[in-house]
Amino acid sequence: MNDMTLYLIIALVPLAGSLIAGLFGNKIGRAGAHTVTILGVAVSAVLSAYVLWGFLNGSRTKFDENVYTWLTMGGLDFSVGFLVDTMTAMMMVVVTGVSLMVHIYTIGYMHDEKVGYQRFFSYISLFTFSMLMLIMSNNFIQLFFGWEAVGLVSYLLIGFYFKRPSATFANLKAFLINRVGDFGFLLGIGLVLAYFGGSLRYQDVFAYLPNVQTATIQLFPGVEWSLITVTCLLLFVGAMGKSAQFPLHVWLPDSMEGPTPISALIHAATMVTAGLFMVSRMSPIYEMSSTALSVIMVIGAITALFMGFLGVIQNDIKRVVAYSTLSQLGYMTVALGASAYSVAMFHVMTHAFFKALLFLAAGSAIIGMHHDQDMRHMGNLKKYMPITWLTMLIGNLSLIGTPFFSGFYSKDSIIEAAKYSTLPGSGFAYFAVLASVFVTAFYAFRQYFMVFHGEEKWRSLPEHHDDHHGEEHHGLGKNDNPHESPLVVTLPLILLAIPSIIIGYVAIEPMLYGDFFKDVIFVNADAHPTMHIMKEEFHGALAMVSHSLHSPVLYLAIAGVLSAWLLYVKLPHLPAKIAQAFRPVYVLFENKYYLDALYFNVFAKGTRALGTFFWKVGDTAIIDNGIVNGSAKLVGAIAAQVRKVQTGFIYTYAAAMVFGVLVLLGMTFWGLFR
């Protein structure tokens, strides 16, 4: 099998499964739908692992070829092609591996759904295909189509429960916010096409960069900026939307309206990292603009810290993990801004495993609670759901950067990158990611203690109905006991827990300080020496653990865990008093810094008001009543006056004729004798 055939199979098999489940779902039934989609994704996952292994043992080399030319227009070729190198192979394994776990998990999670089961499997397989096309693309046009395709599937899955108004509002919100980012992204691609040699293929664009290194572009009369800086910032606007960076982050928490499996696959492990992948892929361009890198670093730092604050007050178990995702995406963005692209991609990989684990473990707890997602109704689930308890504990330990866990190696590397960066804004970024260590540990173990320890709070609740998951689900009754989820749910948790523990230790040296990303990621070490300094300071994975004992990071994490234990296990009455004492801050967090209100009341209502103005004034008053109906009324008015001349009496017409003759004679004599 040649390489082209291999890569086509990896990309297209999930699409085939999606089409079969979507078009023939009623004929093949529920079992047929999940079987065909799981087989398709499993084939992709196995072959992706085979590709990655080939790169690791040196038997495989970089592949960059076009599959076919889709359109030729004015000398410009729009082609479909594959660029498969070590970064692509790593992402292929992450996407297909997590997707496979999610597919298997979905069998148990969606078991009670009466409608839409086949549709759901079709959607998540379609997403897998779309994400593979995005990361395997070798040109901007295919990247953009993959970019839009994953956005479309995200829209469909967030609104999966389309009869629920909150779900339809959430998917529309996600769609519109991402259109803002995509508009900037498209403008950036337009600049690449116009000024970077007239090609959209990555290798051609990178080769042309020396020709535009000092070029400028006029933004306004008298205002010129570096062409590369403007291009980088516009492309990053797209990443801000897709990877949920401040202030385009507001769609991601609401995306929790979709079923939990897609929260794990799309909104934690894969799609939201697409923007980060794009920036890493474009490292040769970004390395030419320190201004763009500074902006990226500051945006990431703001997201990491201030989205973490919002996670502290959440009571929905999935929303805690959602805000955790926002904060971790901010960490990765800080690494990009520090020119530590390999560190960002390393955290993309480790985060994909432990965050998917956290989402799926949260979903397992939700199943045990009969689809009640409110953590205030839980407690002591450790007694009833030991596998869910242990796997969520592992996920949280990795999230907060506990030594020897995967998240420790990648998260601490990001903090080191911010520390050693010399770009403007790096001081703020270092402070923000340090402070976020405490915040992350606090909200992660606040969730853990509320769910798995303490009193069994559902026993003291009145009988209630919770329609958060479909329309026929109820919370636990007072005398009910939760039960551990079935094997089809817990097996993916166990399998995801393994890389959440070991993958960081295994991968840190080759990915960050070895040749794994050689000729894939470009860093200008003279201008941005962060990775060079980090390499000199690195003495092995075990030495990194011992070094952490002398770092504030570990003690900030411990302080966060102890604070959560004190407030939610030992003194559970205290959080309410603290919230009351700091009421203005709590209200600010509760209203999510009022950004939703700003967007709704200013931009949404403002746009509607502007549209209403143009409708009533421009369309109705000027065009309809003025130009169209007004011209008709004017003709009618003139005709009404002319009709008055038509009296029907002969002497009136004779008098008019005599008057006309006299006027003509007068004009004649005037011309003769003047």
List PLM regions with ranges.
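N-terminal signal-anchor/start-transfer transmembrane helix
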Residues: 11-26, 100, 240, 244
